[in-house]
Every structure is written in structure tokens, then in C-alpha cells.
């Protein structure tokens, strides 16, 4: 009886559906990978024995290889979105540009991510690919950075739209008030505007969260592009935070 209640508990059901998704498994592996990256830096700084550091690095490399097939052909949805967004001229122009940059960057990023996988497997070598073998990691980081830049543009534009909308709604509410502080007869409009403001505030919080995640990921991409120099402690911590945010997003979207 207790066993049955446990198995069919809504949280367990949701967890099983969550783990059944390749996207959620990839995010969990990403969390472990960046945790290993952070621990490598931490153990090195603490002068912990070299065997422990090498073990953590080995685990990190194994996880990196395991993540790659879960992202195989992930560029295709972005290519589809690229065509869809380009054809939609009704979108806000700034959001449209941001989404085009985002999907262009991610489409090529995941393409080079596959080449990185082949490189890790030893199928892509300097003999059969020439200079690409040495450039593939940097090119992947470059296109990831382009995709993140597009996402940041979209986030900033969405924030501005929401803030402007709230400002207009507040002005409309204030215009309904008389000079003596009493309310005009159109109280229904005021209630509707307040509800819209609450919805806008929810969008603002989500966009701020997404912007924060994209900025942190940009630090990792900038390092991979060799544009900035950051230690593995900073990069590992940034990756841990963004992985947790990604896991939370997938968990919230999973229906029990």
C-alpha cells in the first residue's frame, strides 16, 4: 500500500517524466560537468593530491562526451525557427532581429558541437580535417556567443516593452482618479489594467531571469572564444548556476 502510494505520488510521476526527456538529462549532465570544472579549480587551489584532480578531470571529460549525442541534430529546430521568424514580418523589428541572430548562432553552434563530439571520439582528426581540427572548439564558442547575443537583445527588448506597457497602464489608472481621490465609474477598466500590470510583472521577472542566465553563459562563451581570460572557478560556478536555471525551467514545464 505504502509502496503503491509512493510510486504513484505526483512528485514521483513528474520526476519520471522529467527524466524521460533527453533535454532534462542533458541539463543534469551539464550541471555535473560544470560542478567537476569548479571542483578541479577548487582542489587545485587547495593543493589536494594530483590523483584527485586527475580523477575529477576524467569524470568531466566523460560527461562532456556523454552530453554530445543528446544534442545531436539540435541545430535543425533552430534552422526551422530561422525560416519561420524571417517570414514573420509582423514581429517587433528588434525582437525579430534578436531571434534571427539567436537561431542563426545556435544552429551553427550545434553543428560545430557535433564536430566537437566527433573530435572527442577520435573520428575527426588533424589528418582528415586539416585546420578545422584545431579551430572547431573556438568556432563552436563563437557561434554560441552569437546565439547568446541574440537572446540578450530579445530579453532587453521584451523588458522595455513590458516596462513601457506598465507605464501606460499606470497613467491610464491615474487618469481615472478624480482630484479628490475618489474613483470614476469605470472601475472595471482599472481592475483590468491592474491584472495586466501583474501579468507584465511576471514577464519582467522571467525576462530578467533569462537575461541573467544568458549573461553568465556569455562569460563561458567569451572564454571559449579567447576574448577574455577567466579561471575555471568562475566558469564552473557560472555553469552551475545556468544549469540549475535550465533544469528548473524544464521541471516547471513538465506536467505531473
Swiss-Prot record:
Entry's family note: Belongs to the peroxin-11 family.
Source organism per UniProt: Candida boidinii
The protein's name: Peroxisomal membrane protein PMP30A
One annotated Gene Ontology cellular component of this protein: peroxisomal membrane
Functional summary from the UniProt entry: Involved in peroxisomal proliferation. Could participate in peroxisomal elongation or fission. May be involved in parceling of peroxisomes into regular quanta.
Membrane topology, record value: Peripheral membrane protein
Biological processes, Gene Ontology terms: peroxisome fission; peroxisome organization; signal transduction
Superkingdom of source: Eukaryota
Pfam family, one: PEX11
Key words of the record: Membrane, Peroxisome, Peroxisome biogenesis
InterPro entries from the UniProt entry: PEX11
UniProt KW Membrane keyword: yes
TM annotation in the entry: none
Cell compartments where the protein resides: Peroxisome membrane
Amino acid at each position: 500500500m505504502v509502496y503503491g502510494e509512493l510510486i504513484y505520488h505526483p512528485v514521483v510521476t513528474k520526476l519520471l517524466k522529467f527524466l524521460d526527456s533527453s533535454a532534462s538529462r542533458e541539463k543534469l549532465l551539464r550541471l555535473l560537468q560544470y560542478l567537476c570544472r569548479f571542483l578541479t579549480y577548487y582542489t587545485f587551489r587547495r593543493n589536494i593530491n594530483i590523483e584527485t584532480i586527475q580523477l575529477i578531470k576524467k569524470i568531466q571529460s566523460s560527461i562532456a562526451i556523454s552530453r554530445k549525442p543528446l544534442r545531436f541534430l539540435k541545430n535543425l529546430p533552430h534552422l526551422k525557427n530561422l525560416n519561420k521568424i524571417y517570414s514573420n514580418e509582423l514581429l517587433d523589428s528588434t525582437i525579430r532581429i534578436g531571434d534571427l541572430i539567436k537561431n542563426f548562432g545556435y544552429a551553427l553552434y550545434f553543428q560545430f558541437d557535433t564536430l566537437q563530439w566527433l573530435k572527442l571520439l577520435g573520428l575527426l582528426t588533424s589528418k582528415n580535417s586539416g585546420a578545422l581540427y584545431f579551430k572547431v572548439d573556438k568556432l563552436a564558442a563563437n557561434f554560441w556567443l552569437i546565439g547568446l547575443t541574440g537572446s540578450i537583445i530579445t530579453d532587453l527588448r521584451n523588458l522595455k516593452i513590458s516596462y513601457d506597457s506598465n507605464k501606460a497602464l499606470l497613467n491610464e489608472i491615474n487618469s481615472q482618479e478624480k482630484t479628490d481621490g475618489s474613483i470614476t465609474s469605470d472601475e472595471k477598466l482599472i481592475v483590468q489594467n491592474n491584472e495586466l500590470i501583474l501579468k507584465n510583472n511576471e514577464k519582467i521577472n522571467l525576462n530578467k531571469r533569462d537575461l541573467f542566465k544568458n549573461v553568465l553563459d556569455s562569460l563561458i562563451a567569451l572564454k571559449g572564444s579567447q576574448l577574455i581570460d577567466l579561471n575555471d572557478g568562475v566558469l564552473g560556478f557560472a555553469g552551475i548556476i545556468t544549469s540549475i536555471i535550465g533544469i528548473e525551467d524544464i521541471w516547471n514545464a513538465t506536467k505531473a
